[in-house]
Amino acid sequence: KSLTKGMAIHGIFGSTGSALGPLLATTLAALISWRSAYAFLGIFNAILAVGTYLTIPYRKRSEIPEEEFANHNINTNKPALIFYFLANGFMGMAYYGFTTFMPLHFAENTTSILPNLTENMKAGLFPTMVFIAGIGGQIIGARIGERFHKPTALMYIIMANIPFLILMGYTSDIFLIISGIFLGIAYFSNQPIGNTLIANFTNSQNRGIGYGFSFFISFGIGSFAAGFSGLIAENMGVAAVFPAMGILLIPSVLFAFLMSRAARSS
């Protein structure tokens, strides 16, 4: 339980950064130039990298006794882990798909909301609201992970994303914003559970590899969805991207179901 809470706290700070990023970038672009937004974020990350290196203590693996590893496991549940990676890959593709075009979609389809704001400001403001909602999703995900069978809970969380992605493609103005907020809650609630599952499925000594491979699949392979979504947006319109990402989650639900079965049988 404490591990799931820890993952939620970690995710909350990540969602906070994701929420502030678009708003900060669009504000700097509007007040100065788009180059200033990139420059500021680059300098900030350089400072953050130095601070991380100086403040986080380093311990060699050989110095850490086995019993000190959280969720100490001696075996890896390979079938469950593989199915999780596959489910996470499709989740990553959906994430890259909808986040790539979410700013443009909000800018073009919220004409009656805050009409005095420019499209550029709306492209930063409304995605920020979605990511702020993700903070609530992290908390909800942690509570769900504490109370229910985590692999099964993840399957239902993935399913919950599908209707909100579809709604985002067919709504505008206030209903679009509401759909986006619920999507933020639904999507980010998967993170504390998913990260805990990696810890549950992996050998304690190989856990870092498990997390690294998971991020590679989600953010590396998942990034290909940006190009795929671009083809959809060019040929069918930006709004069509969101239902397409919802359809993309159907295989993710299937792999999450298989993961749940593999986890129960171990």
Regions found by a protein language model. Name each.
Residues 199-236:
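A late C-terminal transmembrane helix in Major Facilitator Superfamily
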Residues 79-135:
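Extracytoplasmic gate region of multi-pass secondary transporters
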Residues 37-54, 242-257:
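Symmetry-related core transmembrane helices of the 12-TM Major Facilitator Superfamily/SLC fold
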